[in-house]
């Protein structure tokens, strides 16, 4: 099985940042991306396990994959649905 996180077109390192900074950085990064492009987010704030999926739902982006069993957490999102 291939690693979905390895296919990301963009990457955001949010390690050490605390709420609300990671989501603010995700929003800024996604704004610069084209529709359909992917972003890998690496974070260690436990709030991101709730905030990143909520951000995707609210802003109509796709959460392709997430790894939240251990830190650093990883999220792969696609701009748009």
UniProtKB/Swiss-Prot annotation:
InterPro entries: Sulphur_carrier_TusA, TusA-like, TusA-like_sf. The keyword Cytoplasm applies. The active site is at residue 19. PROSITE patterns: UPF0033. Pfam families: TusA. The keyword Cytoplasm applies. Its main location: cytoplasm. This is Sulfur carrier protein TusA. It comes from Shewanella loihica (strain ATCC BAA-1088 / PV-4). The gene is tusA.
């Amino acid at each position: 099985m291939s690693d979905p996180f390895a296919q990301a077109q963009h990457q955001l390192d949010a390690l050490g940042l605390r709420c609300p900074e990671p989501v603010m950085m995700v929003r800024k990064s996604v704004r610069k991306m084209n529709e359909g492009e992917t972003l890998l987010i690496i974070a260690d704030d436990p709030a991101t396990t709730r905030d990143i999926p909520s951000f995707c739902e609210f802003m109509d982006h796709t959460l392709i994959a997430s790894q939240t069993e251990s830190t650093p957490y990883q999220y792969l999102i696609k701009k748009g649905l």
